[in-house]
Design a protein with these regions (language model features):
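Short amphipathic helical patch at the helix-1/turn junction of helix-turn-helix
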Residues: 54, 71, 139-140, 260-261
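DNA breakage-rejoining catalytic core of tyrosine-based enzymes
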Residues: 43, 86-88, 99-119, 174-195, ...
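Conserved tyrosine-mediated DNA breakage-rejoining catalytic core shared by Y-recombinases
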Residues: 151-204
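N-terminal core-binding DNA-recognition domain of tyrosine site-specific recombinases/integrases
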Residues: 3-79, 83-85, 102, 124-128, ...
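A short, basic/aromatic helix-end/turn motif that makes direct DNA contacts
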Residues: 151-157, 270-276, 286-287
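DNA/chromatin major-groove-contacting recognition/catalytic segments
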Residues: 175-181, 283-304
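Basic, Lys/Arg- and aromatic-enriched nucleic-acid-binding interface segment
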Residues: 82, 86, 93-152, 160
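Short, basic (Lys/Arg/His-rich) helix/loop patches that form interaction surfaces
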Residues: 40, 63, 120-129, 142, ...
Length: 304
């Protein structure tokens, strides 16, 4: 059995847990960097085989690119081992290539967000300005992923209990073709509370637009949901004028940061964000948790 055949089996298996477009793009990216390995018998591939290939890749590619490829290769070899295609788990000892964080996602404070919205409100050249501002406010005040916010339909908002049901994500390609898909993980299916202020804004918006219960909350005149670029330019322009860097995903991080800064228990933050495990929340916001340790130290010093 060749490495290519094992790889094909792996991606078929892995593809069951992710969107088809994700599986295709990851497979294409991996294939592009391993043509020399594809026709080798899987049993002839050793630790040295992979590490020599990694060394060659490092001579011409960015470390992060090689790191991602290496991680995928190890997953494929682990799949081969678990399915009896190879007899050794040598992949565990393959050199680790650190994946550098190419960029840190910026966050903004509540005060900065309020200033950003004030700036956004005077950007009158933008079409559907009020809808875009509401979209940004929803992201900041709920921590929703932008794909989850775009998938919201009117009936998923309960104004009696001020809750939003999150059970789908909306993905769109560069040509504008969109699809509704399950949320990122099963744990991302959740119901979250919203404050009275944002609830009233949502209610007023729905009444103003005469939306039916099955309509997408954020949509074009023909009823189709807003695409990937929706509100992106407005956010970028307003952030630049304010002198900060922030993305739609950064608004989600800003929401989580606000909760942690106000000492909301990490388990509640995890559930609100739809993380599968508290460990993921801790890993993502470990710098904030470390800073909060200073609060404990300050308290102890005052006591003693």
């Amino acid at each position: 059995m060749t490495f290519r055949e094992v790889m094909e089996d792996y991606f078929k298996s892995w593809g069951l847990s992710v969107r088809e477009s994700t599986s295709i793009s990851h497979k294409k990216s991996f294939l592009y960097q391993c043509k020399e390995l594809l026709d080798l018998n899987i049993k002839d591939i050793k630790k040295e085989t992979i590490e020599n290939h990694l060394a060659e890749m490092l001579s011409r590619l960015a470390q992060s690119t090689v790191g991602h490829w290496n991680a995928r290769c190890k997953s494929i070899l682990e799949y081969a081992y678990n399915n009896g295609y190879i007899e050794s788990d040598f992949y565990k000892n393959i050199v680790h290539i650190k994946i550098k964080n190419a960029y840190a996602i910026s966050v903004i404070t509540e005060n900065q967000f309020q200033q950003l919205i004030k700036i956004a409100k005077v950007q009158t050249r933008h079409t559907d300005l009020e809808e875009k501002i509401l979209f940004l406010e929803l992201l900041f005040k709920t921590g929703l992923r932008h794909s989850e916010a775009k998938a919201l339909q009117v009936y998923k908002i309960n104004f009696d209990s001020n809750e939003i049901r999150v059970n789908q994500s909306l993905y769109c390609d560069i040509k504008g073709k969109w699809e509704l898909a399950p949320t990122k993980t099963p744990c991302s299916n959740r119901t979250i509370k919203i404050d009275k202020n944002i609830a009233q804004k949502l209610k007023d918006f729905i009444e103003l637009k005469h939306k039916n219960r099955d309509d997408f909350l954020f949509s074009y005149e023909d009823g189709s949901p807003r695409t990937t670029v929706f509100a992106k330019d407005l956010l970028k322009k307003s952030a630049n004028l304010l002198g900060v860097k922030i993305s739609a995903h950064g608004l989600r991080h800003s929401h989580a940061t606000m909760l942690i800064r106000n000492l909301v228990p990490i388990q509640l933050v995890q559930k609100r964000l739809g993380h599968a495990d508290p460990a993921l929340t801790i890993a993502t916001y470990t710098h904030l948790i470390s800073d909060d340790e200073k609060i404990i130290v300050d308290l102890l010093e005052k006591i003693w």
